[in-house]
Amino acid sequence: MQNIYQQGLDKNAANYTPLSPLTFIERTAYIYPQRTAVIHGQRRYTWLETYTRVRRLASALADHGIGEGDTVAAMLNNTPEMIECHFGVPVLGAVLNTLNTRLDA
């Protein structure tokens, strides 16, 4: 049963776009390029800057032979670079294996 306020608001191209994490960052960089995406200490990145850095990481990994089905391990703190890994590695169809630096052995 639909909520009374949802009647007549079926999903369509004008009000709904299914997004994966990869299509999310691409679409957000297109629609909100100058909005802040990441704040880490004194560093700030817009959505366009973040997306550009993600694409640059993906390109560098591809240049080193990383591709679909490969696994990339990353041992990083919770930094903008880790966010870039979460998007940049899957762009290639590879899997990201994160190694948390805050956990004891």
Where are these regions (language model features)?
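Conserved AMP-binding/adenylate-forming core of the ANL superfamily
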Residues: Y16-T17, E26, Q34-T79, I83-F87, ...
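Short beta->alpha connector loops at strand-helix junctions that form conserved
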Residues: L99-T101
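Structured binding elements
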Residues: G93
